[in-house]
């Protein structure tokens, strides 16, 4: 995502002069650019893996077809549901977060700097941003699994027990707002635009890639790791792996699951203990 962040900053970012004004031109151009990006990444990956079956079921976590004619999904179809939520809500919220931060920076309300002004801090921020994103996600994701928020918001995302690229951003609009709100950090600390795009693309394109349903994409001898077995188990079992695999949250909460029978037994024990405490 860092390379893509540099690409967007260098060639696809609106000028600060434009961003200082909330004019329809650059706002629409930003929305269209983000739509193109997600269509290339999520749409292209979906076509390769599921329409053209470019690598069959090799390295696929779950070989079942995506559900159709299921009332739980919009249009009674998982893929159409996922595309609609990703595009109509996900990309709009992503674009809003980007445009808001750029406008605040362009009007001097928050601070930015050139790469040459603070090269050490630029590199430090690049190293820290993935950790910030993982910890922020782990915290808000665990909150989304509280009963009130899960039933009303997060259950939309968990309709997808068997995920594909379009499932990554298929969620309730409220969850989109929460997901992209980790950019609030940039309201507090000076940043370079690359940092903004690194954070946004971590979700906007990273979520589709981590939900491919495959461990890796293969093109002849080339193998590109994209899947996330840790999170795949979360979609299947729900009550485990709330954080990213790098996050200490699940180890701290006792909810880490590595797919082994021993982890299954621990989860069953935890469920029994929870049921006993609820009934008592």
Features from the language model and the residues they span:
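Functionally important transmembrane alpha-helices
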Residues: 189-247, 252
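Acidic (Asp/Glu-rich) catalytic motifs at the cytosolic membrane interface
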Residues: 136-163, 210, 214, 226-239
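N-terminal start-of-chain detector that recognizes signal peptides
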Residues: 10-13, 158-159, 203-204, 220-222
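Non-catalytic, topology-defining segments of multipass membrane proteins
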Residues: 1-139, 143, 152, 160-181, ...
